Design a protein with these regions (language model features):
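Expand to "…catalyze enediolate/carbanion chemistry for C-C bond making/breaking, isomerization
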Residues: 1-256
Length: 256
């Protein structure tokens, strides 16, 4: 019996459009609710969300069996956290602040068992192998691991042609918030200069033959980035959905 099929990776590699939701509230209930609503993927945010390993595991369980695929964003691309998140059962990881092809290759190596990488071997003890109930897990896990690297500085954007061609990198995701800050336009994600850099980045990623992703909360942004070759878009977040609903409800009350 092989490792579970990663349908998100298959979709990404085939060029199929994938729309997803950011989960930052660290809530299994929210994850379960989001997973039942037809998004292609939900990302559990371990970088900015208040997520530790037990909370990440709870949300992975909540998404298991749902039609939505789970992604975990780790705080940084260190071996120990990638190993533990993969052992928890995540098959797709997003690693922030990757700036060079060398860093990207290092991330891929940390996610793969030998001989392709150096992921620590403890699969018999963990959820990823259904606690050793998947006999061929170790031999088949590598092909089901999906690696997404996040580029979010000017240095990284200039290095996209090399980063995107690293074997084992399946998707390059542009982070507009940190990118805008790095360019001197803090919190101005739609500044014209920022959009020019993102547009070139999206085209460079697509030209390398891997999935190009970014954040696109508005229909206008979604159309723009799809037109630039984007196939992997974050279209909302649990926090913004909840906040906007609260504000709309309060506004409606004030009008009565």
């Amino acid at each position: 019996m092989p490792a579970p099929k990663n349908k998100l990776k298959s979709a990404i590699l085939s060029g199929k459009m994938q729309y997803g939701l950011w989960l930052s509230l660290a809530s299994p209930g929210v994850a379960e609710m989001a997973g039942s609503n037809g998004f292609d993927w939900c990302l559990i945010d371990g970088e900015h969300g208040p997520n530790d390993l037990p909370r990440i595991e709870e949300q992975l369980r909540a998404l298991a069996g749902q039609p939505t695929s789970a992604i975990v964003r780790v705080p940084q691309g260190d071996d120990w956290i990638l190993k533990q998140v993969l052992d928890l059962g995540a098959q797709t990881v997003l690693v922030p602040m990757v700036e060079t092809a060398e860093q990207a290759a290092d991330v891929v190596a940390a996610c793969k068992y030998a001989p392709e990488g150096r992921r620590g071997v403890g699969y018999a003890l963990v959820r990823a192998s259904n606690y050793n109930a998947i006999p061929d897990y170790a031999k088949t896990a590598n092909e089901e691991v999906c690696v997404i690297v996040q580029v979010e500085t000017l240095t990284a954007m200039k290095n996209i042609p090399q980063i995107a061609r690293v074997p084992g990198v399946d998707c390059v995701f542009i982070g507009p918030a940190d990118l805008s800050a790095d360019m001197g336009y803090l919190a101005e994600l739609n500044h014209p200069d920022v959009l020019v850099v993102i547009a070139q980045g999206m085209k460079d990623i697509a030209a390398a033959g891997v999935a190009a992703g970014t954040i696109a909360f508005s229909e206008k942004d979604q159309k723009r980035f799809v037109g630039q070759g984007g196939t992997f878009l974050c279209v909302e977040a649990d926090v913004t959905l909840f906040q906007s609903a609260l504000q709309a409800t309060k506004l409606a009350i004030n009008r009565t």
